């Protein structure tokens, strides 16, 4: 059946929090009632001076693919040629690069468990031929990836699989991702064209998500490109503008969304974040705890947006223009020129 599942991880619930000039965040992750932990997350508040990164990775068949995604996704993003000018392209490129790493050799797994002694390099060199010739990619181990990049006045979301991102705008729940499930029409048609079928809402009766990093047992049709395999790593991309009514977003694994609908999550968080009672870490923990009856690992990142600050240079420029043209005619001066 291919590579055996990675060694299960058992861990206590963990949380983190932080902030910069744009956002505040908190995260919480728990193994729940599952025997092993296969979720992973990554947060880089300042990936660069203008960019924040958040990612949730829900593993299946083992934890190591999710762990590798959490370790490498944002670093690969920084390295991508489209990182500065075309983040949607960069996100897509990273998804395929991760798949390539997993297919090529065992080096990705070695990077998660570096040798602790000086014989490490010797051992790797001695086994390099074995890795490249006889290495078996993770056949039934894979991971979702739901990543959120905040840059300037935009939120860019890339999603592979059934983890999810939901935004609250003035109390309205806005889905910023699409759950890739085998029973959805477009996904089912691709699966069937690649030679598969959907049974009990799973691919071949086994896999409950139709897009993932890894899972190479479902990517074996030599007549199809990677984007048209039964399981593909092609992400859906969504770009949303940040406006004055943008409140917060939640990125979470399906252990959360299986327990609560989007609107319920938004209302739950809004209730917890009442003015004067704001505690993001506690709110995130309560949200995940509320969903533990789903019997799955559960991971959530809560990102709260700070009020949009006016650009001092833009305000000064607008003020000067107004002073030069005090009458202004019928034209209204808008010093908060947000592009929606």
Curated annotation (Swiss-Prot):
Domain of life: Eukaryota
Any one GO BP annotation for this protein: signal transduction
UniProt binding sites for Mn(2+) 2: 58, 254, 296
One of the Pfam families matching this protein, by short name: PP2C
Cofactor binding, per record: Binds 2 magnesium or manganese ions per subunit.
EC number: 3.1.3.16
Residues in PPM-type phosphatase domain copies: 24-305
Annotated Basic and acidic residues bias: 316-340
Reaction equations catalysed: O-phospho-L-seryl-[protein] + H2O = L-seryl-[protein] + phosphate; O-phospho-L-threonyl-[protein] + H2O = L-threonyl-[protein] + phosphate
PROSITE patterns xref list: PPM_1 (PS01032), PPM_2 (PS51746)
Record has Manganese as a keyword: yes
Residue ranges that the Swiss-Prot or TrEMBL entry lists as coiled coil: none
Residues that bind Mn(2+) 1: 58-59
Disordered as annotated region, ranges: 1-21, 311-340
Gene3D superfamilies in the cross-refs: PPM-type phosphatase domain
InterPro entries: PP2C (IPR015655), PP2C_BS (IPR000222), PPM-type-like_dom_sf (IPR036457), PPM-type_phosphatase-like_dom (IPR001932)
GO molecular function, one term: metal ion binding
Keyword terms of this UniProt record: Hydrolase, Magnesium, Manganese, Metal-binding, Protein phosphatase
Cofactor(s) the protein requires to work: Mg(2+); Mn(2+)
Family designation: Belongs to the PP2C family.
Xref: PANTHER family: PROTEIN PHOSPHATASE
Protein name as it appears in the record: Probable protein phosphatase 2C 21
């Amino acid at each position: 059946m291919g590579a055996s599942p990675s060694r299960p991880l058992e861990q206590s619930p963990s949380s983190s929090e932080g902030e910069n000039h744009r956002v505040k965040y908190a995260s919480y992750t728990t193994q729940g009632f599952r025997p092993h932990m296969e979720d992973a997350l990554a947060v880089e508040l300042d990936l660069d001076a203008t960019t924040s990164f958040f990612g949730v990775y829900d593993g299946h068949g083992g934890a190591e693919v999710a762990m590798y995604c959490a370790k490498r996704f944002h670093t690969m993003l920084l390295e991508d040629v489209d990182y500065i000018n075309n983040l949607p392209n960069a996100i897509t490129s990273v998804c395929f690069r991760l798949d390539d790493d997993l297919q090529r050799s065992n080096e990705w797994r070695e990077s998660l468990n570096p040798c602790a002694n000086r014989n490490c390099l010797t051992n790797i060199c001695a086994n390099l031929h074995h890795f490249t010739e006889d290495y078996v990619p993770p056949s039934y181990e894979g991971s979702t990836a739901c990543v959120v990049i905040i840059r300037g006045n935009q939120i860019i979301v890339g999603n592979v699989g059934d983890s999810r991102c939901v935004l609250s705008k003035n109390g309205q729940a806005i889905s910023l991702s699409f759950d890739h499930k085998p029973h959805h029409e477009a996904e089912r048609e691709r699966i069937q064209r690649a030679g598969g079928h959907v049974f009990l809402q799973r691919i071949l009766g086994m896999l409950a998500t139709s897009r993932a990093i890894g899972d190479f047992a479902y990517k074996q049709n030599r007549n199809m490109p990677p984007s048209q395999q039964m399981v593909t790593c092609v992400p859906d991309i969504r770009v949303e503008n940040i406006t004055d009514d943008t409140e917060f977003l939640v990125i979470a694994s399906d252990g959360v969304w299986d327990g609560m609908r989007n609107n319920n999550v938004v209302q739950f968080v809004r209730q917890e974040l009442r003015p004067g009672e704001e505690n993001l870490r506690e709110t995130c923990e309560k949200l995940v705890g509320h969903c533990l009856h789903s019997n799955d690992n559960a991971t959530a990142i809560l990102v709260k947006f700070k009020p949009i600050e006016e650009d001092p240079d833009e305000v000064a420029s607008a003020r000067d223009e107004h002073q030069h043209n005090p009458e202004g005619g019928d034209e209204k001066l808008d010093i908060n020129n947000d592009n929606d």
